[in-house]
């Protein structure tokens, strides 16, 4: 399924991300969505201040992606590219995202992002190891 970019209201993007990740991104800067040919939103990306304090240097943004949950396969690498371009045009020099090790990071790979670090599981979140991915 191919997607095209559509604007999304901040509150709608946050609600979608909260349903998937159970956490609201803080310090939101922008959001963008991907819709199918029928105009239905399939995936959302929210760019915000990094959750890791060491990355919160004023020049880095973190992007959280969330599928709407329709069950259909989604090709959202255009969202990765759009977020990178938007962040660059706003003056940010680094863009990162996290991918759980039990999930595929093929979308990030197809968009040219690369894994730069692995993070151990956080206390209270179960045995979830994540990889830090960085935009080119």
Predicted features and spans:
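Short amphipathic alpha-helix that is part of the acyltransferase structural core
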Residues: 1-29, 33
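Conserved beta-hairpin
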Residues: 28-45
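Acyl-donor binding region in acyl/amide transferases
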Residues: 35-37, 48-127, 132-135
């Amino acid at each position: 399924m191919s997607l095209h970019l559509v604007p999304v209201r901040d509150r709608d993007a946050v609600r979608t991300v909260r349903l998937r990740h159970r956490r609201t991104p803080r310090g939101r800067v922008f959001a963008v969505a991907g819709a199918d040919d029928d105009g239905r939103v399939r995936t959302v990306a929210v760019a915000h201040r990094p959750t890791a304090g060491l990355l919160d240097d004023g020049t880095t943004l973190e992007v959280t992606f969330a599928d709407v949950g329709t069950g259909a396969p989604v090709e959202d690498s255009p969202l990765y590219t759009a977020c990178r371009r938007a962040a660059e045009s706003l003056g940010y020099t680094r863009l990162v995202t996290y991918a759980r090790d039990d999930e595929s990071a093929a979308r990030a790979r197809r968009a040219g992002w690369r894994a730069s670090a692995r993070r151990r599981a956080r206390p209270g979140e179960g045995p979830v190891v994540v990889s830090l991915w960085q935009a080119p």
